[in-house]
Amino acid sequence: MIDLEFYKGKKVFITGHTGFKGSWLCEVLLMAEADVTGYALEAPTEPALFNILSLKDRMKSNIGDIRNLEYMKKCMDEAQPEIVIHMAAQPLVRESYKNPVYTYDVNVMGTVNVLECVRMTESVKSVINVTTDKVYKNKEWEWGYRENEELNGFDPYSNSKSCSELVTDSYKNSFFLERDIAVSTMRAGNVIGGGDFAADRIIPDCVRAAIKGEDIIIRNPHSVRPYQHVLEPVMAYLLVAQEQYKNHELAGNYNVGPNEENCLSTGDIASLFCAKWNEKSGNNIKWVNKWDGGPHEANYLKLDCSKIKQVFQWKPLISANKMLELTIEWYWKWINDFEKCSKEAKSQIVSNYL
């Protein structure tokens, strides 16, 4: 499993560090005493976990667009990182239908720019490109997709991430093999956890409704997703980055998702949230099924994570039940005892992984 001692003093460059998942990643690395540099747009939501954790004051934070090759090159050149983790993206399916050109520009050409900066930075030894479980051509079957399945996402977001995989493979074959740079893509499922305030995501929608005392609107309660706590993929990214740094032959493409018994429908997640929130608050919130006629989204999606388990002996540590408990505890602190939000994040990292 991951050895955070490995990261002590390591120079790590993260794109997308101001986002939800990026903020959790930065918190873990700072706890490990890594030398962390971030490159991203301003935090995408208000409130934002990045600001709640005061990350701007604890690391080198560059505010910039990954489509700006020259500025990102300048920032990476100054940082001289050994490890690069690329997370910056336009991450929402429904938003990609509204703004497909922007989505492709950020997710495809943005990836080209990140890899081009890596190509021009001699210090880099290990690279992780964070994509998504949605890179696969979805056949609506009950089996988990394996890393050798066809890449062909349906919607602009998913498809742009499929393209990002191909771009990474091309750069790897064309430039990085001869430089001995280890490059992996990692395909994680839907993540939940404290500090997510984005639109069109199950837990933020649940929290917003619960605070207002309103019913939670669920668009498609029967859709199955590989939901997992945000710390699961974050720790997996760090594990693979660490191990391929030591042994470049371990670089590849890896799924990251929950065990079979924790693959739940959106309705299951909403029901768990309501039960645990009501138990904590004494309220009686509920969810309702209300399809809003939105664009196509896959109904059934699972990942086969046998490869990462076999190669790295990785395994998910947080059950679905625990995932909801940790998530609600963080939001409860945010609502009722704001000063303890940062401490709660650190506590969840320590209690589950250290």
What are these regions (language model features)?
Residues 1-188, 298-299, 334, 344-353:
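N-terminal Rossmann-like NAD(P)+-binding domain of SDR-like oxidoreductases, especially those catalyzing
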Residues 31-38, 64, 190, 210-354:
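C-terminal substrate-binding subdomain of Rossmann-fold SDR/epimerase-dehydratase oxidoreductases
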Residues 193:
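Flexible loop/cap residues within protein kinase catalytic domains
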Residues 7, 17-19, 84, 171, ...:
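Generic structural signal for small/hydrophobic residues in well-ordered secondary structure
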Residues 163, 167-171, 206, 269, ...:
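Hydrophobic alpha-helix immediately C-terminal to the catalytic Tyr-X-X-X-Lys motif of short-chain
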Residues 12, 71, 102, 109, ...:
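Residue-level recognition of oxygen-bearing side chains
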